[in-house]
C-alpha cells in the first residue's frame, strides 16, 4: 500500500491525515497550507504549492520527514505510480529535442559536464525524474514522468536552468511467499539406526518391558530456501514462509528468509528414546531404535511488489527432518 501521512506541525505533531491516492485540492480535505511534516510508505509523492498539481513542487520518497522545505505551503498531493525500477531520460540542448542530447540512467550533477544550465527539452523513456535548478537537488524543480515529452522549457519558465537530475526511487520491495504444498516432492527418505538393545525372555510367559536407548538422540529439522537463478530480489530483502515444520509441536511455524543473509536454519531438540516392547515366551529380541530421515522440496510462489509494479517469481523451500522415531523388533526363538 502506498500512503502519505501529513501532519499539521513538525516532528509529526498536531492534526494528521493519511492519503492513498492523488489529492488535487487539499482545501476539500480541510488540510490546505498546513503541512509541516510527512511520513511516506511505498512510492514517492509530490507536494505541490497550488491546487491541481501546479506551482512549485517537492518530491519526497519513502521515509519520515520531521520538517519540510514547503512548510505550510502544500495545496495538492500527487502519487507517483510509474515503474521506477529502470529509469532513463534524454535531455536536449535546444527546444524540440534539438542540439546535443544526453541520455541519463542515474542521478547526475550537470555542473560536472557540458549540459549545465543548458537544457531546453526532454523525453522520459522510463521512470520518474526530478530536474533541479541548482546542484545537490537544490532550488526549484520539475517532475518528469514516463512517456512525457516536454518540447520547450520556455513554456514553464525553466529554460537553461537545470543543474541536477535525479531519478525518483521506489520504496522497499514487498515480498509475499506462498508455499505450494500440493506440489510437494519427496527427494529422499531413509531409515537410520540410532541404537540397539538386546533382551532375552527365558520364561514360558510373554514378558512386557520398556526398552530405553543409552545414547543421546537429537531430533532435528533443517529449513532452507533457494532463489531462482533469474531472481530480481536484491540482497537484504526479507519475507516470511508460513506453515513450515516446527520441531517442538511438529506443526506449522514460520521461517523468515533474508536474501544473502538468512536463507537456512536448523533446530535441534534432545529426546529420550523409550518404548514399550513385548517379548514372546522363550525368545531372544533385538530391538533397533530407528529414525526416519526425510527430505522434501516444495515450490514457493513469490509475489514481488515494487511501488505500482507486481512480479511473480518462484523459489524452492526444502526441509530435511529427523523427528520420527520408532523401533524395529526382531525375535528369534531359543531352545
Curated annotation (Swiss-Prot):
Q: In which tissues is it expressed?
A: Epidermis specific.
Q: Which InterPro entries does the record match to this protein?
A: Aerolysin-like, Beta/Gamma-Crystallin, Beta/gamma_crystallin, G_crystallin-like
Name the SUPFAM superfamilies on file: Aerolisin/ETX pore-forming domain, gamma-Crystallin-like
Signal peptide positions (record): none
Keyword Transferase applies: no
Q: Can you give the residue ranges of the Beta/gamma crystallin 'Greek key' domain?
A: 2-42, 43-81, 87-126, 127-169
Statement: the UniProt record of this protein carries the keyword Magnesium = no
Q: Entry's Pfam families? A: Crystall, ETX_MTX2
Q: Which GO terms describe its biological process?
A: lens development in camera-type eye; visual perception
The record's keywords, sorted A to Z, are: Repeat
Coiled-coil residue windows: none
The GO molecular function terms of this record are: structural constituent of eye lens
This protein's domain notes: Has a two-domain beta-structure, folded into four very similar Greek key motifs.
Q: Which family does it belong to?
A: Belongs to the beta/gamma-crystallin family.
What is the name of the protein in this document? Epidermal differentiation-specific protein
What organism does the record attribute this protein to? Cynops pyrrhogaster (Japanese fire-bellied newt)
